[in-house]
Amino acid sequence: MAITTAASRLGTEPFSDAPKVELRPKASREEVESVIRAVYRHVLGNDYILASERLVSAESLLRDGNLTVREFVRSVAKSELYKKKFFYNSFQTRLIELNYKHLLGRAPYDESEVVYHLDLYQNKGYDAEIDSYIDSWEYQSNFGDNVVPYYRGFETQVGQKTAGFNRIFRLYRGYANSDRAQVEGTKSRLARELASNKASTIVGPSGTNDSWGFRASADVAPKKNLGNAVGEGDRVYRLEVTGIRSPGYPSVRRSSTVFIVPYERLSDKIQQVHKQGGKIVSVTSA
């Protein structure tokens, strides 16, 4: 699976030329176990799973040849385990983004896809929402009955929209990253750009772009100091913060908040942010 020459910086290098994980006829026990691990890793967004959380019955059916990989994927996606991780505590649009990522290996291409699944869930429920991905022609033509879903959004394919390549990197934040261990939490990553029909700039998942999980705020947060320096010197910094929770602080539903701070007050501001429970995701020159 050739991706790009920047694979190491985008966190996709482990998938370069990696073979598809497939359950073949007369597979050995080790091969079956490898398939089970691959399904859990991909469908659960690389989140940790306890031994007590494993789907013992579905695993047994797969080992005995009474369940295809496709149906095992369906069992995981419909399980209480999946719901606890991604359904009960997430915005509906976030769940749809993750369903596309986990079950079809790509990001939504446009807002109409999200609207369709919102309507489907409202009218027919959770199980119908999951079935719509796994029973789709797209799933069948790419994974069939016995291939574990993988990230298709990293490569160019027939019928793929270019925006999908950029958007998959809003959902995928590195090989070792988990879908439940990101700065933006359970909020939608793509709602704003899908609504405006724009694709965001790709931001690498590691230190290549100032911090691990950071991307510049897409709203009105200032990106530059628009006036004169306000300190004794001319060094002014842009401090981007997320997750501030403190009495009297406005609760604004957005991924980050920006402060323009002179150098001599930078240390004090950082301490204040930490006391308010915030996370500093970027410090750049303003």
Swiss-Prot record:
Outline the extent of the CpcD-like domain.
Answer: 234-286
Topology class, membrane? Peripheral membrane protein
Family matches, as InterPro entries: CpcD-like_dom, PBS_linker_dom, PBS_linker_sf, Phycobilisome
- Record keyword Thylakoid present: yes
Query: What Pfam families does the annotation carry?
Result: CpcD, PBS_linker_poly
Q: Which domain of life is it from?
A: Bacteria
For this chain's UniProt record, which GO biological process terms are given? Answer: photosynthesis
Q: Name one GO cellular component term.
A: phycobilisome
Q: Which family does it belong to?
A: Belongs to the phycobilisome linker protein family.
Function recorded in the entry: Rod linker protein, associated with phycocyanin. Linker polypeptides determine the state of aggregation and the location of the disk-shaped phycobiliprotein units within the phycobilisome and modulate their spectroscopic properties in order to mediate a directed and optimal energy transfer.
Q: How does it assemble?
A: Associated with the phycobilisome, a hemidiscoidal structure that is composed of two distinct substructures: a core complex and a number of rods radiating from the core.
Name of the protein in question? Phycobilisome 32.1 kDa linker polypeptide, phycocyanin-associated, rod
Q: Which organism is it from?
A: Nostoc sp. (strain PCC 7120 / SAG 25.82 / UTEX 2576)
- Source species taxonomy: Bacteria, Bacillati, Cyanobacteriota, Cyanophyceae, Nostocales
- The gene for this chain is cpcC
